[in-house]
Amino acid sequence: MIPGSNPGGRIHNVVKMFQSYFMDAVNGYYRHLAIIESQDYLEKVNSLVEEYLEVNKKPRVIYGFHPWLDNSKDRMIEFRKKFENFLDIDYSNSEKYLGQSVDLVILDAIGDFRPNYIARFVDMTKGGGMAIIYSDDILRGKLYKESLTRDGVVKDLFERRFMELAKRYRGIIFLQGDRLTFTPYSSNETHKSHKKIPKSPKVPMQLHELCLSSDQNKVLEESLFITSPGKRVLVVTAARGRGKSASIGLFLSYLMTEEKFGNILVTSPTYYSSQEIFNFVIKGLDALNVKYKLTTSKDGKIMKITTGESRVKWVSPDLARNEEGDLIVVDEAAAIGMEFLDYILQGWDKTILVTTVHGYEGSGKAFLKYVNRLKSKVLLKHIKMDYPIRYAKGDPIEKFMFDVFLLDAEPAEVMYNGELKIEDVSQEELFQDNNLLKSVYGILVTAHYRNSPDDLMLLGDMAFQKIVVGYSSEKPIAVCQVVSEGDLTDRQIEDISNGLKNEGHLIPHRLIKYMRAFDFGKLKGWRIMRIAVSPENQGKGIGSRIIEEVIKMAKGVDWVGSSFVADYSVLRFWIKNGFTPVYLSSIKNEELNGYSVIVIRALSEKSKGFVVKLSSLLKDKLLRTSHQVYYNLNPQLIALLMRNTYSERRREGEVPDLYVNKIKAYIEGKVPYNVIAETAHFLITKHFLELKVNLSIEAEASLVARVLQGKSWYHAGLMLGLSSREVEERVKQGLEVLLRTYS
């Protein structure tokens, strides 16, 4: 017998009451969510499913689980027998199924109760349908929670809040043991979206007919903005489930048939983020009765669609940097990083930015700030979509998901008055006060472009962390999340050095595994996971004051550090606050679309020795491998790193007379750059090792791009926002200063 089953069937009558509510949900196109926590979970789920089948005889079903956990496959097989249209999805591969829409979603939460998975799968449920989450015990035996556990210690503040909110919300069936909590919702409170085709549309009627909401019709027509002459940016934002990617896909099919843009690129953090665009390009071309050719990858991904002289193809963000074309579409732009967007906008005349706001793939709030700044620099049109198409407006489960995962959390509106009260707030205090939690979490998600529901669980459940809050006028305006790391045993250090994960100690893990700094693991440290200030109060020194307070709190601690995705302005902030770069990842983190940097502020003599040695090695690595390992890194960032790291390496020696003569000849225009390339390399290496002159960051970055990274004048210009000629002028000016200083 499968664990969790109960052949007695005594619960059947408890749930034999929902049929009329399920029918009302079909009429109102809203969803139900069922949460079942019970030892006889299978019997309860089966009874609920039987009732649902009375309303929908042949539902499309998605089943989420970890197939390799004990008994999980057996449970899945039992459910599969009940349905004709059944798709089982491994949680780990669920990103591939973004955009799916089905009647019934069943989630096996016996071995995992992870916020990202719950948000993603519940979102696949369409109006009139139901999502079911079942578990024997939501608080124990969960994979993601184990990753937050250290020395057997972990909290359960996130789950308890989740369950408390579930009991209060209408439309949620909560069965805990034999206790049922359920308050019905009503179809009178919902409004289903409908298409609204303009009287004289410029985009073909066949494409408008494929739309499911007036918002989608609006996107089709207003996107024509991008086709007018000159540099233009089109921005499309919406919460999840509004059909923004579908709308852009239909619009691209129109552009292809008109052959307005011959070469269209689509990029996104992962291919699956933008697969709906390609699906709807195909639907659009089919509706227009246009023949096309598909180019697919070995695993079946549609990588390119070609018709006539036009093509749409997907490329990764890294490759998109060096591609050329007529139009580029960046899907899930909020999750891709503002530095990348700056680079794209520098090189492209026609750009479409599509992103989710209030989504589980990353907060769009930082992106919206970015868009507002763009409006003063470029001709920009911003289209907002409000109406959901997967379910009706007013859907109770969307409201619950927004609240339980704080997808729309906003910081309190208060201007800094010069007074800052800084306090250490416990996790328990935070999760007991929902207003405080929303304000604090709102600051975190507004200030950072990469956020997910998992972050909220980490905030509530991971022990060994401090939450420091800065208040002005009694309201939070800044937050710092700190976790204790280090103080490792010899066995733990050996395990990490042999490749075993220990993500609870991120900074020691990276420095032990990749830098082989074994004894660093014995030091006690604090890692600042996140520090954020509300948008209207940034640039006023508040973050720096919070850091100084954290340093004061760090009694008996050897170091305070941070790890983040390499970004020029962020790195400059940490350097300004006395932190030294000691590590830069050699491989790009594809999920975060960037390289990770570690900075450390030494608080003890022991840690200072490590900082000097590690930062010297980092400088040496940058000097030797920027042409290879860090070719795509922002040259300004490389220059900033090398200007703020130590130098233990030997000096380069005197500049040979022939080198001096060659550089002078280049500056005077008598020989081309390639003739003096090795000379320039010698001189810039000597400069960064000795740092005898304060060369401007612009000049240093130009030298880094051309000399150390080996970029062409054109690609160096793209990275720096300059013309090829301007880059060469800066290189000559920089070499002239270096020659005077070091020869």
Curated annotation (Swiss-Prot):
It catalyses: cytidine(34) in elongator tRNA(Met) + acetyl-CoA + ATP + H2O = N(4)-acetylcytidine(34) in elongator tRNA(Met) + ADP + phosphate + CoA + H(+). It is an enzyme of class 2 (transferase). It is found in: Cytoplasm. The keyword Metal-binding does not apply. The keyword Methyltransferase does not apply. Acetyl-CoA binds at I531, A532, V533, Q538, G539, K540, G541, I542, G543, S544. SUPFAM superfamilies: Acyl-CoA N-acyltransferases (Nat), P-loop containing nucleoside triphosphate hydrolases. Catalyzes the formation of N(4)-acetylcytidine (ac(4)C) at the wobble position of tRNA(Met), by using acetyl-CoA as an acetyl donor and ATP (or GTP). This is tRNA(Met) cytidine acetyltransferase TmcA. It comes from Saccharolobus islandicus (strain Y.G.57.14 / Yellowstone #1).
